[in-house]
């Protein structure tokens, strides 16, 4: 985000320059240099993350997301954050690195009710469609489920079902906001 702020500052300076002047082109080079640095920073992080995942896991399950809807103003109001993640680039990097190492990237359909299904008793509860509900208790088995962790477990289980895997899979554990702990 620091580079984004610097970019905004330099773009404001550029907008004040007279188009076609020597100072305009000097400022344009500065703006382009920051764009280039941001792109390289993002690519470097994604390459390091996907290499780590591909080296440590044979099967990775992800949910296909409606990124266009998430980025739209009427959607989830995550616009800049969704674009900063470069999810499509991430999945393509991860897929080719897993293929090179003999692994598999399994994509679970976005309409699969991952956050609405209890991972313990597999009953579906549409009340959890509301995104503000972060934890919920299953009325059937009385298990308290964290929305994200429960969804991650359901995506893992669905991917295992799609692949025909019955043996347990080592779960991905990432630090911070970059992932969900799924056991």
Over which residues does each language-model region extend?
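Substrate-contacting helices/loops that form the catalytic groove of nucleic-acid
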Residues: 1-91, 165-183
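Positively charged, low-complexity nucleic-acid-binding target-recognition regions
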Residues: 81-183
């Amino acid at each position: 985000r620091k580079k984004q702020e610097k970019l905004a500052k330099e773009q404001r300076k550029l907008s004040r320059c007279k188009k076609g002047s020597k100072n305009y082109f000097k400022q344009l080079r500065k703006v382009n240099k920051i764009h280039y640095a941001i792109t390289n920073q993002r690519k470097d992080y994604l390459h390091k993350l996907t290499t780590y995942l591909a080296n440590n896991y044979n099967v990775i399950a992800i949910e296909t997301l409606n990124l266009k809807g998430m980025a739209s103003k009427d959607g989830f109001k995550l616009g800049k954050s969704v674009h900063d993640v470069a999810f499509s680039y991430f999945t393509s990097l991860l897929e080719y690195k897993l293929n090179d190492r003999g692994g598999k990237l399994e994509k679970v359909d976005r309409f699969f009710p991952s956050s609405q299904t209890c991972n313990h008793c597999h009953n579906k509860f549409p009340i959890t469609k509301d995104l503000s509900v972060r934890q919920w208790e299953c009325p059937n088995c009385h298990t308290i489920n964290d929305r994200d962790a429960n969804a991650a477990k359901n995506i893992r289980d669905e991917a295992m079902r799609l692949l025909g895997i019955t043996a347990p899979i080592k779960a991905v554990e990432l630090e911070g906001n970059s992932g969900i702990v799924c056991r």
